[in-house]
């Protein structure tokens, strides 16, 4: 017989550095999920990834207090900042202050990496979404 799902929880956790401190501990603890078990499983699953990379994770927890989790790709903003080699986007996007520039080839590589997490029908649609995110961060797309 299948386990009865009690709920789902979405968190964004840095790769390789899940620990019981806030925000992870309280979010899991109030739902009765074993915090240390999640931290160990998540850190083991992300040990090959770049340390500190933000990973969205969807935790499905069951009435018997067990859980499963699915990791997604890092947010588009992470990839954009990494490709443009900047720490943060523009404070005033669209007002003339550019935070950096990206080429269409860089946007396409980000789109290919994020394709399964985006609700785009094809790579062109995914690129359009990513270009919109880039403009919102004050990045200019050239090429």
Swiss-Prot record:
- InterPro entries attached to this UniProt entry: Ribosomal_uL11, Ribosomal_uL11_bac-typ, Ribosomal_uL11_C, Ribosomal_uL11_C_sf, Ribosomal_uL11_N, Ribosomal_uL11_N_sf
Q: Give the organism's phylogenetic lineage.
A: Bacteria, Pseudomonadati, Pseudomonadota, Alphaproteobacteria, Hyphomicrobiales
Q: Which family does it belong to?
A: Belongs to the universal ribosomal protein uL11 family.
Question: Whose protein is this, by species?
Answer: Rhizobium rhizogenes (strain K84 / ATCC BAA-868) (Agrobacterium radiobacter)
The name on file for this protein is Large ribosomal subunit protein uL11
One family from Pfam that matches here is Ribosomal_L11
Q: Which GO terms describe its molecular function?
A: large ribosomal subunit rRNA binding; structural constituent of ribosome
Q: Provide the record's note on post-translational modification.
A: One or more lysine residues are methylated.
What are the GO BP annotations of this UniProt entry? translation
- Which keywords has UniProt assigned to this entry? Methylation, Ribonucleoprotein, Ribosomal protein, RNA-binding, rRNA-binding
What gene does this protein come from?
A: rplK
Q: What does this protein do?
A: Forms part of the ribosomal stalk which helps the ribosome interact with GTP-bound translation factors.
Q: Name one GO cellular component term.
A: cytosolic large ribosomal subunit
- Among its keywords, does the record have rRNA-binding? yes
